[in-house]
Amino acid sequence: MLRLAMTIVLVALGTIPTQAAAPTAAQKDEFYRVCMGIAQDDALCSCKAEAALSLIDERFMDVVIASMKGGSPKAADYDAYNTYVAKSNQVCKPNY
């Protein structure tokens, strides 16, 4: 009974972690199109689009795509954005 009560309280407070949704196929396609417009490198853009699926979630994919289009990540996303760029470069540009 106590466990049920604690679960209800945590749900009400919004403190139970939820699993974020993976990026969508449409986001992956948009990422690839935007990347190709910048880099004109199929191997790199294909790799980065694929890597993004395992490195970031659906919300953050929008942050990345907006940044690729010239936007800046919000302050709260800045560290995560830099981490994403570093990890995707490790995967797709190992000698970078």
Describe the residue ranges of each PLM region.
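Post-signal/leader-peptide non-cytosolic segments of secretory proteins
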Residues: A20-N95
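Classic N-terminal secretory signal peptides
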Residues: M1-A20
